[in-house]
Amino acid sequence: IVKEDNPNLMIITDDVYGTFSPHFRSFMAEIPYNTLCVYSFSKYFGATGWRNAVIALHEYNVFDRQISRLPKDKREALNHRYATLTLHPEKLKFIDRMVADSRQVALNHTAGLSLPQQMQMSLFAAFALLDKENKYKQKMQEIIRRRLQTLWDNTGFTLVEDPLRVGYYTEIDMLVWAKKFYGDKFVEYLKKTY
């Protein structure tokens, strides 16, 4: 699609579950020019909710290119918006604009994570890089598969194989489950009550 139909396609990918998939390869690795990647260490390291995440964008990217191609009046409006940050707001990278916008531009000097969060993410990243044989990754994938299978084994239904399944989440139709084990009357009760 990017090569043949839309070279200016902007792709935003959330790779948070990629580490749970044995053969995952990010769009960031394939088409970095077009991809903004969001990744969180939280689920992989059992720290869900701690907001240990990063946004990655290639130095040369379609987002910056498209901003530079905006009509003059739009570029001037953007230059005015970011003029408090730099003497050359027209050169401000898209990723820096995101940081500024996340802090409502005027509070940009407060941007970033706290030192404990930065240290924690640094340790998570170092740990992952030092695990050359991916033992932790394989263990996490095995735990997720085992938990998913245990859940489904206890529903009375068979989990259909899916080579693309990560298994961190699953959907169970509770009305189908209720009908199978408790009948239509219970299903009607659930529908009326919930």
Residue ranges and their predicted role:
Residues I1-Y194:
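PLP-dependent class I/II
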